[in-house]
């Protein structure tokens, strides 16, 4: 696997270190537990394949407006997040993921708090923070709201990963997210929230601190 250097610097804060991807972190993420449907698109099991792991690392280390981080706690990978610094809508945060074995300790909130605090200081003229999330991801929404995000739009969206799996699962598996999906114009769609956080919006310090 390549050991190519990346120009992205680490970020420290809220008990975490957000580090750029490297071969060791890819190995750790490959060993994470998986959530499965309907959150399967975030699972990292594909990194167990050496070819896919190498390809993913190459993408993550490319010089790009997209910066990819792995949140580490005492050297252990506990979450991941990416940000597009040149999206027309704002500083677009995406690929927010905490594996099940690290849930319940505020990793998501702390990871985003560290990232946004750093970007606000490093890019004083940068626009607002934006992220989108499928409406069934309610635990994530609690974290986003605690950090000052507000829903500014609700839309129906074609999510390729969700749509492909919906063709394969039965009514029983679809039922828990039934009110969040629809079959429209010949394909499956999922309802999505667009969240926005204005620069300087207070973050819930209790929600973001290490536990």
Regions found by a protein language model. Name each.
Residues 1-13, 196-202:
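Acyl-donor-binding surface of acyltransferase catalytic domains
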Residues 20-26, 30-95, 99-101, 112-113, ...:
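Acetyl-CoA-dependent GNAT
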Residues 99-101, 105, 135-136:
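Active-site acidic-Proline motif in GNAT/NAT acetyltransferases
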Residues 109:
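Residues forming the Rossmann-fold NAD(P)(H) cofactor-binding site
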Residues 151-153:
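A secondary-structure capping/hinge motif
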Residues 163-194, 204:
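A C-terminal cap/extension of S-adenosyl-L-methionine-dependent methyltransferases
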């Amino acid at each position: 696997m390549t050991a190519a250097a990346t120009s992205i610097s680490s970020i420290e804060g809220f008990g975490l270190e957000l580090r750029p991807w490297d071969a060791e972190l890819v190995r750790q993420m490959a060993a994470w537990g998986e959530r499965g449907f309907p959150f399967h698109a975030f699972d990292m099991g594909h990194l167990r394949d050496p070819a896919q792991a190498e390809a993913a690392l190459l993408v993550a280390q490319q010089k790009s407006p997209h910066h990819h981080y792995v949140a580490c706690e005492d050297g252990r990978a506990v979450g991941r997040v990416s940000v597009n610094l040149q999206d027309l809508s704002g500083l677009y945060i995406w690929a927010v993921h905490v594996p099940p074995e690290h849930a319940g300790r505020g990793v998501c909130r702390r990871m985003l708090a560290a990232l946004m605090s750093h970007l606000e200081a490093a890019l004083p003229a940068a626009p607002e923070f934006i992220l989108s999330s499928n409406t069934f991801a309610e635990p994530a929404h609690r974290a986003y709201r605690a950090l000052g995000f507000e829903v500014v739009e609700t839309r129906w969206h074609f999510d390729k990963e969700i749509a492909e799996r919906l063709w394969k699962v039965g009514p029983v598996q679809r039922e828990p997210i039934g009110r969040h999906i629809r079959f429209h114009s010949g394909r499956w769609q999922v309802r999505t929230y667009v969240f926005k956080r204005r620069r300087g919006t207070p973050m819930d310090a209790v929600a973001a601190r290490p536990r």
